[in-house]
Amino acid sequence: MLSLQAMAKMAVATNTYSKYHYPILKVFGLWWKNNTLNGPIKICNHCNNITVGEYPMCYNHGMSMDVALIRAVKDRNISLIQLFTEWGGNIDYGALCANTPSMQRLCESLGAKPPKGRMYMDTLIHLSDTLNDNDLIRGYEIFDDNSVLDYVNLVRLKIMLTLKARIPLMEQLDQIALKQLLQRYWYAMAVQHNLRIAIHYFDNHIPNIKPFSLRCALYFNDPFKIHDACRTVTMDPNEMMNIACQQDLNFQSIYYCYLLGADINQAMLMSLNYGNLSNMWFCIDLGANVFKEARALAGKKNRRVLQYILGLNIFKRELIPPCKDPDPSQIQILLKNYILKNVSTVFTYYCQ
């Protein structure tokens, strides 16, 4: 049950007030100031999110009660920890990111279970498996700069995160810091499952995430996100094509890179090398013609049937009309239900 003081603060936080009330709000404990925040604390009447400062939309700047509590624990702001806990924040999440013994004791005094053993890893896996905007944001906030992860098996953790994210988070296991790896992991999970609120939150809170957002968009075949990321990120079209070819059936990503000037012959060979044959046939439909090199590569990979098929002189090229500009709407309409034309040519040849 809420204390009378917590109820009074909640009543004030859910109402509108002017700048003339700011001195009172500071005294009243409804003010949050740290390195990134400095303003009055408000509660959105529609979604119960916490906002700090004069923001008209909590979607853009708000945080759930749990996230507000987690960030208060990281700030070591005792009064806000107590307040957000009374308002309904889950103090167990606070205990998982308590960065000093005194903060840990405070969380436990407010009802948190003492974190033990696998509780940290179990929580990380659980929050990413629910595929929920708020849970991904909670996971990011709990484990960002969390010193407890210094004591886990880093190689095993990195492999697990990469497998769950379904996208290469790094080139080599020792090439990236754990903090950056986790940031990429939460972002990749949000993009993979199209969790727009989480994506928007991470775009605003994870520094230098834009280059990785382009990689995610290419890997998960989203021309709209590719188009958006290309406004702020500069990447060589052939490097973009390499990323697009790593996941099969990425026709829209491949076509976008092709329109930017990426080498479609190189894309054909990369797709074959990755074992993504649908991508390879799509490149042939676009005009790729390095059949001699492709046959040699198929032979090295012991794909004898494919090696023979690629030697047939039956293929048609440039079967897809090029767009003038890489317009994501046109690309999606053109390729959403695309049928590989040269695959049909092969079937027709053998069925005659």
Swiss-Prot record:
The keyword Protein biosynthesis does not apply. It comes from the Viruses. GO terms for biological process: taxis. Keywords: Early protein. Induction: Expressed in the early phase of the viral replicative cycle. Plays a role in virus cell tropism, and may be required for efficient virus replication in macrophages. Belongs to the asfivirus MGF 360 family. This is Protein MGF 360-16R. It comes from African swine fever virus (isolate Tick/Malawi/Lil 20-1/1983) (ASFV).
